[in-house]
């Protein structure tokens, strides 16, 4: 928020005339004019925050006016690093604070750090109860959300908690597995909370009509619930479609569109991998009245047009862009994302949105996550390499590359005010991607 005191020239002239008549009035006006010139409360720009999974618009994209086009020969500098425990939840940043959610010594730990220095501001924890059946890491899978001075975390075993962003105190907590009789899934609970108005929404797969649940942000009380679907690993997204706010959720068996206000189901579109032990983790991508969805395990990709009761299928096929766990980004009519299963090797692809035509494919990167900043792709591979390349259908032409993390880096990163935040199995880093001449403008962060 920014507050300005504005005076017209005539107003100032009149007041100066009165000031000459009264020394008291003159002093008062001088003070007001000084206030008008000197007092401007800090304004958080759109580039300054990455407060939730996939960024401010929940689509993996952000405008960064101060992003460098070239990096130093030795690579971008690491401003600070912080030791982290198990988990796949990415960092989030709001008003100069960074939240990281991970598992350390038998506890799920929420840490708030100064985003500029990495200094710990507060931390909160509780006993970690999740046990993985396949030998994978047992830390949180979900990325937290920050909204209206609150932090929302969703643990691997279903502990849903609201924290005070300023102090770290626990505001309310819900054991969703106990309250809604949910399972733990093959690989734990992974939905990153979505804050929409006064509700925070989860894809939890509960019984008795509690497949998708909206909770009151202030109290944690249920505002609405819908479907009997089991949960997938995908996180919901909200958008204005058909003139109303809607919530789109990929459950275990379908893409479901709901009214954001009351949870009424608008449509269901069958969407399920053909094999049971599978992952559907990519968040729907909304482009105007169109919805792009993607999954691996023989599922493929579809472009739909929003319609009441049933979406129109524009195109749907498996050989285009089958996302395992990372959501694609869109720039000027072209999708950019990883195709294929992580353990089998993936290709980075560019796909024309309107036709589904593959423009180019780049193998050899294994798997990774793509972030769009302005017209640049920031590709974080699971090997920990950060690659910057123009978002262009003409081809994959990296301009910058640097090793910023060790293997394995699978959590979604954050990009805020020119700083790139990313984590590996045991390390969180803050990497400076600002243009050199923008450091002064970013110093007030």
Name each region found by the language model.
Residues 8, 24, 29-30, 59, ...:
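Intrinsically disordered, low-complexity, compositionally biased regions/tails
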Residues 27-43:
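Bacterial N-terminal signal peptides
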Residues 43-445:
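Noncatalytic, solvent-exposed loop/strand surfaces
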Residues 9, 20-21, 38, 43, ...:
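Intrinsically disordered, low-complexity segments
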Residues 14-17, 39, 48:
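A composition/secondary-structure signal for short, hydrophobic, low-basic-content segments
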Residues 1-26:
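N-terminal secretory signal peptides that target proteins for export/translocation
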